[in-house]
UniProtKB/Swiss-Prot annotation:
Function of the molecule: An accessory protein needed during the final step in the assembly of 30S ribosomal subunit, possibly for assembly of the head region. Essential for efficient processing of 16S rRNA. May be needed both before and after RbfA during the maturation of 16S rRNA. It has affinity for free ribosomal 30S subunits but not for 70S ribosomes.
Source organism, top-level taxon: Bacteria
Assembly and oligomerization: Binds ribosomal protein uS19.
GO CC terms in record: cytoplasm; ribosome
Chief localisation class: cytoplasm
Family matches, as HAMAP family: Ribosome_mat_RimM (MF_00014)
Recorded family membership: Belongs to the RimM family.
Protein known as: Ribosome maturation factor RimM
Alphabetically ordered keywords of this record: Chaperone, Cytoplasm, Ribosome biogenesis, rRNA processing
Compartment annotation: Cytoplasm
MF terms (GO), sorted A to Z: ribosome binding
Annotated PRC barrel domain residues: 95-167
Lineage per the UniProt record: Bacteria, Bacillati, Bacillota, Clostridia, Eubacteriales
Length: 170
């Protein structure tokens, strides 16, 4: 799936009385916020850019003061909005690593060329991700391990896997 804009955070509420907002990071790279000069804010189908002023971490959140927002009342109107970036602004990943939104929607084939279905979700388990494949019946859970996932071709929208023995019966 090739999204035009990728969500990297969600504004939860205001922070203080000067118009700052508390953001839940939706990215594995929350440090990116400190290096941003502007960010797109999307709320109820409308998008606009804001200039990033002060940024700091507070517990598991990011506090951002946009230069255009001067008051708590103005910041309150942004509650529930998403912070988004274009694909060209994504943090580059190492080779053989992929963004979840690129994996969802891929067609999955076994090494023999049999179509197993489509990736509909990615479970983040801590040890390794697990791809949820819609087979038309019971979902197939495929561990995202090099021994199992033989290739991913985003251009072709295709993933090739070598299923461990018995995995389809689980």
């Amino acid at each position: 799936m090739h999204e035009s804009y990728i969500r990297i955070g969600k504004i939860l509420k205001t922070q203080g009385n000067r118009g700052a907002v508390r953001v839940l990071p939706l990215t594995d790279y929350p440090e990116r916020f400190k290096n941003m000069s502007r960010v797109q804010v999307s709320l109820k189908g409308f998008r606009t850019f804001f200039t990033v002023g002060e940024v700091y971490h507070h517990k598991n959140f990011i506090i951002i003061k946009f230069k255009e927002i001067e008051s708590m009342a103005a910041a309150e109107k942004l509650k529930g909005a998403f912070l988004e970036v274009g694909r060209d602004e994504l943090v580059p990943l190492p080779e053989d690593r992929f963004y979840i939104f690129d994996i969802i929607g891929l067609k999955v084939y076994d090494t023999g060329g049999r179509n197993l279905g489509r990736v509909t979700d990615v479970l983040q388990t801590g040890a390794n991700d697990v791809y949820v494949v819609d087979t038309g019946g019971k979902p197939l859970l495929i561990p995202a391990l090099k021994q199992v996932v033989k290739s991913v071709n985003l251009t072709e929208g295709k993933m090739v896997v070598e299923l461990p023995e018995g995995l389809e019966e689980l």
